[in-house]
């Protein structure tokens, strides 16, 4: 256990504050060491029995504050369950540290139980792979373990030229794996001197210039940067919008305040009415929003396009139409010479909200567009919201409008999987406090083990789960799929009582029968201050038709922008 304690304490000195622990024997030294550090208030320890769910829980916790969260698992198949969360951490640039126990080299390739080639399981999704000594980390000097911790921390945080992401530390342990209480008390009195973690140096060259005196447009995609950089990013964008007068097409995930100037509300319904010359400039921030219409619109555009990312140098332009620069918005605007301080009049906007309110009244049967329109208004201002990476994130982009800016919206669109949806939300709520999750039924069922975190934690996360139950994969209803086997091949409806499943985990729930009951149900759910489920049933076929009808009708509303 001494080596495990040395390693974990070195990570704590770098800044590790939270660790999610999964059960196992080979990982016993790490578990015991984590318990010692937790007893000394050096580490917050969370336990979880499902490694896949645990990794997503940790990823949600890391995303909430932009800090590394560690996961500890035993050896064997347990390690393979970390891959989905590692992939999402890679693509969404979130720091995650995966500590896996392993057998020593003497037990490798000889048929020993629970011994697999786990070193290679996560390689493709990780920023860095590190390994303890093959004979067991007990053979390593403290300096070597300290250096391993510092290197892992740097890589997870995005040191050098790479963005934050997942790091895999594979740690062989030789028996004996477990220590006596007396030995633990002796080890707990030891302490390591702090070792500094050097700051990364960006080393980024000059970026393409854009002319604020000429026409242009800003497309703000999902925010994918460090939490500490967000305020500077917002201020830089605010300045550019005032200087240029360019319209802003903002994704709900862009982490922008509602008073951001020049914002076009419900822009996805009005792209064809934007009054811009063919050679207008385009400033794109971060990844693409989840809009095929925007993609087609940008591909038709003939003017220069600049894509700015927040420290991620990897290619992020699936349209292949933009010059990419990874220095961040704040650094880019600082490079633009001779910017005038005068503020241009903001662009004309066509607010479709009054029209949408007549089309989507807060009464009658539940529909997905109506929920996307009303929930941002009815949920308390500044309550964070997580949107499942399926229909909810797309519906809020299209129908949510101005009120989306009242909430910091999250959605794990790095790899856009629905796996881990509930566990991710639990992790966010554990660190952010009260949070609402908007999800479909398949995404929730796919990660139903996430409900385990409702009862395993000492203080259950205050999470309000808004389940849009439309009997299967509603996202497929919006695609041009023509097959007689649509229900069984694509929609895949499941015969599961979601309220009963939640209740089996001690989670209270209610059914919302109509939109008139929504406001009272939200108030009840938020008052619980713990995980709670609201089930809202809709008809996905009817909702798909409603979306088409509203899109067509919106073309006749208002004038050219």
From Swiss-Prot:
Note accompanying the cofactor annotation: Binds 1 thiamine pyrophosphate per subunit.
One biological process term in Gene Ontology: phylloquinone biosynthetic process
Function: Catalyzes the thiamine diphosphate-dependent decarboxylation of 2-oxoglutarate and the subsequent addition of the resulting succinic semialdehyde-thiamine pyrophosphate anion to isochorismate to yield 2-succinyl-5-enolpyruvyl-6-hydroxy-3-cyclohexene-1-carboxylate (SEPHCHC).
Name of the protein this chain belongs to: 2-succinyl-5-enolpyruvyl-6-hydroxy-3-cyclohexene-1-carboxylate synthase
Record family assignment: Belongs to the TPP enzyme family. MenD subfamily.
This protein's UniProt keywords: Magnesium, Manganese, Metal-binding, Thiamine pyrophosphate, Transferase
Listed pathway(s): Quinol/quinone metabolism; 1,4-dihydroxy-2-naphthoate biosynthesis; 1,4-dihydroxy-2-naphthoate from chorismate: step 2/7; Cofactor biosynthesis; phylloquinone biosynthesis
Enzyme class: transferase
CC cofactor: Mg(2+); Mn(2+); thiamine diphosphate
InterPro entries: MenaQ_synth_MenD, MenD_middle, THDP-binding, Thiamin_PyroP_enz_TPP-bd_dom, TPP_enzyme_TPP-bd
EC id: 2.2.1.9
Subunit (UniProt): Homodimer.
